[in-house]
Each structure stands twice: as structure tokens, then as C-alpha cells.
Amino acid sequence: MLKRPSKLQTTIDFEKNGKQTGYIRLPHSVHRSAYGWLPIPIACIKNGSGVTVLLISGTHGDEYEGQVALSKLINQLKPEEIQGRVIIVPMANFPAAKAGLRTSPIDEQNLNRIYPGDPDGSPSFMIAHYIESQLLSIADYGLDLHSGGSSLHYVPSAVSAVGENKERMKKMKELMKAFAAPYSFFFPSGHADGTTNHAASRNNVVLIGTELGGSGTVSPECLQICELGIKRFLQACGVIQAKT
């Protein structure tokens, strides 16, 4: 499926230096708009050569901590502060995020269970295909921000799936330590089928995730853990320098 071209498009030039903001255009042909599209926000901040880091939130639309933190980061992060490239997708499943729901109100799909997606599928499958084929395919590191959403509340944690690649596992542990959530844990790889973790593994991307609070709210404590953790994560990836 990944070899078939994505129908999603963006005005972002991922090879261009500087800060760019815009949208991934998700085709959505309906009665009121035959050639309509849904706007998935995206930013690319690049300065010269270096690693590429992909930051994602809003996979589940009712998980707000990551969406708030990444939206703020887009405004704050300057090209001259980095070496390499940071790609930020704060509302990955835009239909779900707009509605404040875990799953998409358009096709009822859970974006974090359907990777590698399908370029000819329903909107959620098309999003999953784009993220894996166009974004994870060019990334070295990834951070997938989650919380408990409306129905769960997690202790603030950094998480990832167990893998067979020892070097990749070692780096994931380093990134978890750098993120410095109160808790960190690995879950069995069998639980990762269809998830961003599974997609990252296929693309040899060193990716960790988070579970930061929930209950359909945003707490100042979890938001601070998220914001500070993102900065330490970027430092550990080597894309920004620690301030002295």
C-alpha cells in the first residue's frame, strides 16, 4: 500500500530552510463541496543539514496536552535555534481533533490502529498512509504525544513498544530518560499492531510516545511535563542545544 501515491498534498517544502506553516490537504468530496478538502495543520522548521524529528499529537482528538504543547512550540521555535529539521503535526487526525473525539466522526476509525493506512481508503486510512509514507519515511526520530482522552486518566508516562533491534531499543531508552516523565515503560510489541509505533519500526525511526493525564481536560502539571519533555527530547535527538 505504501508504494501507491498519497492523495494528500501540502504546500510545505520539506527541503527549504526556515519556518513554514500550512496544511496537509485531505480530500473530502461531499454533497456541499465536490472538490472539498480538510486542513491538517503542519509546520516544518529547518536549518541546514542534520537529523529529522517528527512530532505528532492529536492522533486521538480528545487528547489535548500534546495539541496545546505542539501548537505553542510552532510559535516559539526559531530556525536559528535548531540544526536539522523538525516537522510538527499538532492535529494529526484533524476531523477527530476538531470534534474533540477519540475517533473520527467521518469514518469512526481510530487512527492509531490502522497503519500503514490506505491511499484509496476513507479519510483516516488516507491520513495514516500519508504519515507513514511521507513523514515517517523521512524522519530519524519521532515523538507521538498521547493522553487518556475523555475515558481514561494516565499517570504521566513515556512509553514505547519492545523491539528486536537492540541499538534502537537503547536509543529509545535514552529518549525516555531525556523526556523525564515521572514514569516510563515498554509494552509488548504485539500490542503495537496498526499503531504509530509499528509504523515507525517499519521505517527504522526511533520513536517514543507519551500518556499524559487525560479525563478530557488539560492540567497545568501535565502540560508542563509535556512542554519541558519535548524540549529535552529535541536536545537528546541533537536538533537543538541545551541552554546554559
Predicted segments with their positions:
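Structured catalytic-domain cores with a bias toward divalent-metal coordination
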Residues: M1-T244
